[in-house]
Every structure is written in structure tokens, then in C-alpha cells.
Amino acid sequence: MITFIDDNKDVYTVESICSELPIAVSTYYAAKSRPPSQRQVEDEVLLAEVVRVHAENYGVYGRRKIHAQMNREGFEIGRDRCERLMKQAGIAGVVRGKKPRTTVADEKAERAPDLVDRAWETVREPNRVWVADFTYVRTWAAMVYVAFVIDVYSRRIVGWRVSTNMKADLVLDALEHAIWVRDTELDGLICHSDAGAQYTSIRHTERLGEIGAAPSIGSLGDPIDNAVAESTIGLYKTELINPKRPWRTVDQVEFATFEYVDWFNHRRLHAAIGNRPPVEHETLFYNQQTAPETGPNTNVRALH
């Protein structure tokens, strides 16, 4: 009630507001003259930090992720308090929409079997399973297509490419980028995608064979079969593309995607990997592999 009076006293007098509310003018001034409580002081500090965390992360974090990031930074704040301060600041997370359909299958192309079978949770190390997909972005200059390659273990975007067409070169360039980024032996890797013609093309299949990787194709028209890629593209559209429309040029989309991927990999918290950024999750994995063993090795490779 005190806050309401403060918010409106520039328009109406304190006396006129109090006459309409169950509060005496003397009570209002007495409350204003009291020093702030410890909790109020803490709220002021935490409110500024909540706003900062929200702004530093594309303005997309909701209560859960702001709460998680605040705790990572050493702030003691509960979820309810975090939600209350977000409401006070007038900020909220974004709501993800549906990914538009871009897949056009080649009915004549031979399709690899589904080697993953939606068993995402059994991938227990990097470079065991990659998933691939692409989406489109409307610009004033042209339609733009953006392809991604994602490591299922860490949710890291390991390769991406922007193009003005959706021919096989688009997904091949994204694959080449991923191979370059990883810079390691990839023998035994599974590269999973939907049944789009770009992914069932001979060139794409042959390139996977050259690096010792096996293609894996989900069923036609079922997005759950490529859920990790679908989720990543959904985040990309919801967190970057849709809020910043209209897009003017191809270069604008490419530069913004570059910045987004850097944030996505190094700073964005992912619930599926313990509210860590992908690069941090991979670093933790490799550190555990080089640490002295204290017991039986329980790191079983589930998909290989």
C-alpha cells in the first residue's frame, strides 16, 4: 500500500489517496520515516542483480534460470523471492513457439536407419552423437537458411552455417564447421537428422563415411525423432530471431547468429545438463576423465 501511494503521489496528493484507502495519513508518514528493514535492503541489492542477469542473457531468462544463475554467482535467493522481484521489475522469460517445417524429403533417396531411437539420455560423452537440422529467417533482402550441428551430450552447437539457399551445401558446410571445431578423431560418431533431402544426399552420406561417422535418420514427419535439434532451433528462433525482427540483411543474421552461438555455448544455462553452459559441461567431463581414479570406472559408453 505504501508503494502504491508512492507511485501515485505525483498525480494525486497523499491525503486524497489515503482518504480512498484504509490507511491514515499519519500511518503513511510514519512508515516512510522508519529505516528500511534488513530484508528491504537485501531486496534492493537483489533486484538490481536480477535485472542485470536478465539483461545479460538476451532478456530471455525466466524465474528458474535467473534463480539458477544468481545461485551460481553466490547470491542467496529463493525461487519465490526471485519471482517476486522479477514481477517488481516488470521482466519475464520468453515463451517458445513452434518450429516451422523446412524438411522436404527425397522419396527416392536411400535412408539410413535410426541408430538413436530417441535415447538421448544414454549419450554419456561428447562426440558420440551429433544431431543436425536447419531453419529459415525472413529478411528484407532474401530468405535466409541457418543450419546447425549439435552435440547431444553437452547441447553445444559445434557447427553452423548461414546461406540464401537450402541445398546440400548448406548442411555440408555446417558439418565441415563442426569437424573443424572438434579437431579430433570422430570414428564411431553417429550423426542424426531428419529425412530431409539434404541429409540423405549422397554427398552428405559420403562425407560422414570419410570421417568414420554413421548417418542416422529419424522417421519422416515426426519431430520427436530429432528432439534435441528441434529444441535448439526453437530456442534460436524464440531467443534471437523473433524478438529482433525485422531482419534486414543476410549479414545481419549471420553476425547475430555468431554472437548468439557464442553465448549459447559459453554462458546459457541448459536444464538438461544440470543448468550449466555446454562448454562448461564438456570441460567438467574431460576433467573427470583425467582425474585420478578412486573406484571402478562407471562411465559406460551407451551409444557407439
Predicted regions and their residues:
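Charged DNA-binding/catalytic regions of mobile-element recombinases
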Residues: 1-304
